Amino acid sequence: MYAIIETGGKQIKVEEGQEIYVEKLDAEAGEEVSFDKVLFVGGESAKVGAPFVEGASVTGTVEKHGRNKKIIVYKMKAKKNYRRKQGHRQPYTKVVIGKING
């Protein structure tokens, strides 16, 4: 059984026992989290939401928080001596999917 959930403005296909990386969640490591925005549940009988499947949820456990690799943002305007260099590291949360209800 699998499901498609929406979190952090992104849609992610998940299965039970899978480890996923999502935008930073406001939960401590070891805490249970529930994703209620379930768009699709697949298995023997598929359920498609309009836009969400009623009564469906996906639960998981927060394993850790972290930050992705640094990306460099560089702006430059030719012939004007304008240069700006800035780094960015996006925070993430690693979640282990436990149960798909739906």
Swiss-Prot record:
GO terms for molecular function: rRNA binding; structural constituent of ribosome. GO terms for biological process: translation. GO terms for cellular component: cytoplasm; ribonucleoprotein complex; ribosome. InterPro entries: bL21-like, bL21-like_sf, Ribosomal_bL21, Ribosomal_bL21_CS. Keywords: Ribonucleoprotein, Ribosomal protein, RNA-binding, rRNA-binding. PROSITE patterns: RIBOSOMAL_L21 (PS01169). This protein binds to 23S rRNA in the presence of protein L20. Part of the 50S ribosomal subunit. Contacts protein L20. Belongs to the bacterial ribosomal protein bL21 family. This is Large ribosomal subunit protein bL21. The lineage of its organism: Bacteria, Bacillati, Bacillota, Bacilli, Bacillales. The gene is rplU.
